[in-house]
């Protein structure tokens, strides 16, 4: 039921609790209360793609997931948008679960001694939140948590996509994304 609600329930951007709302570097919620659904992930990921372009972040994006029930469907949704935007995505071999520090380390190692072609990352995790929750965090090229200037920008852009019924969100099928 939780995963079905992720795909079936559409957030109402006029209801504050159903909008994208970044806390500590990420957006968290549950598909049962319409605070973490596919539309949230599609909108946030497109906003990140635009942010990357505006900041000239054109290296690979490291995509990690954890063991929460909504992480795999959210990862699929994010990958469809990232691929449609031409972002090179790096994932753990065999789609293994990836803790946040592993993604941070991958970003730092990749960016070491680089001035251009920098990497960043998305981690699909609600961190310490309950099993029914999902979450998405964005790590910029410094490998750490995004500051409020970044998260506010992504949040505002994502909410504009929600308000426009995802108009402007690029997406291809998962099969094509692979």
Predicted regions and their residues:
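Gly/Ser-rich phosphate-binding catalytic loop and adjacent alpha/beta segment
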Residues: 1-178
């Amino acid at each position: 039921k939780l995963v079905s609600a992720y795909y079936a329930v559409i957030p109402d951007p006029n209801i504050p609790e159903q909008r994208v709302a970044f806390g500590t570097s990420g957006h968290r919620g549950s598909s049962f209360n319409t605070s973490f659904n596919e539309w949230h992930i599609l909108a946030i990921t497109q906003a990140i793609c635009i942010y990357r372009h505006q900041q000239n972040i054109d290296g690979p994006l490291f995509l990690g997931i954890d063991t929460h029930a909504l992480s795999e469907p959210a990862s699929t949704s994010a990958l469809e948008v990232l691929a449609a935007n031409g972002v090179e995505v790096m994932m753990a071999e065999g789609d293994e679960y990836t803790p946040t520090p592993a993604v941070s380390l991958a970003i730092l190692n990749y960016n070491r001694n680089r001035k251009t072609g920098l990497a960043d990352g998305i981690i699909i995790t609600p961190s310490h939140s309950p099993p029914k929750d999902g979450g998405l965090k964005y790590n910029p090229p410094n490998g750490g948590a995004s500051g409020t200037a970044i998260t506010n920008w992504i949040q505002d852009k994502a909410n504009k996509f929600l308000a426009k019924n995802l108009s402007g969100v690029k997406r291809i099928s998962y099969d094509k994304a692979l």
